[in-house]
Each structure stands twice: as C-alpha cells, then as structure tokens.
Design a protein with these regions (language model features):
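Formylglycine-dependent
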Residues: 1-102, 110-124
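A short beta-strand-to-alpha-helix junction
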Residues: 76-82, 128-138
C-alpha cells in the first residue's frame, strides 16, 4: 500500500481499470474462494499511523503502520463518478493540511485518460472526448 511507502493517505484503486470491472464480465469465475484470492480489492482509503498493527489480512498482507478501509468495488457504474470521489478526497486532504499549517504533497490522478473509461450519460459523445474527433485532417 502507498501508506507504508511514504504517503500519509491514499484513496483510490491499485489496478488498471479493466481489472476492476472484470468481476462484472459474464465469464468471470463466480467461486467466492477465487474472488477472495484473485479478485480486485475495492477502492481503498488508507492512512499511515504510528501504531504497528500485526494483523495479517488475507487480501492485503500484514497491515503494519496503517489503517485500510475497502470502500467497495470499482464497478462500471461507480467508474462514472470515481473522479468526483477522488477529487473531493484530494481537496479535503489539501484543506486539512493547509488548516494545520503543514507542508504537503498531493499526487492526484484521474481516470479519464485511462482505458477503460465509463462516464455519466450526460458526458457521453461530447465533442473532443473521442480521440481523433475534431482533429484536422491533412
């Protein structure tokens, strides 16, 4: 987890987006043991702590000096709004650091430049969202 590698907080997913939506595919294994061992973890909210938690989580490994909250899967439907969630979390983090008078570094990556992208209906088929559309031709 990023929070045991120098980050104070992390909110997001650890996989490329199509790995997150694979469990929704018709041919994805339905066996709960398979999903528990190989399925993607959800959207995670993690915080570094000073307390060493020796618990070994079957999905995350040794917890260590952090807290880990799985906020749920990154489904195709949630992908429509995940950038809103992560942007809100980033702004909240920055505001808290400013209010505390602490210097900070915020690494914020949205999902819109990645393959696969699922957007809300009102954002579909808008000019400029599809590569090549509105590009001058030679």
């Amino acid at each position: 987890m990023p929070t045991v590698h120098g980050f104070d907080e992390f909110f997001g997913n650890l996989y490329h987006l199509n790995a997150e939506e694979e469990p929704e595919n018709f041919n994805y294994p339905r066996d709960p043991a398979f999903r528990a061992k190989f399925g993607p973890r959800g959207v995670l909210r993690c915080k570094a702590t000073d307390v060493d938690d020796p618990t070994v989580d079957p999905r995350f490994g040794r917890v260590g000096k952090q807290t880990i909250e799985d906020t749920g899967p990154l489904t195709r439907k949630r992908m429509e709004t995940i950038d809103d969630e992560t942007s809100d979390a980033a702004v909240d983090y920055m505001r808290r650091q400013i209010a505390a008078g602490k210097p900070f570094f915020c690494w914020m990556n949205t999902t819109r430049m990645h393959f696969r992208t699922h957007v809300r209906p009102e954002h579909r088929d808008n000019p400029g969202l599809i590569a090549g559309r509105n590009m001058p031709t030679a």
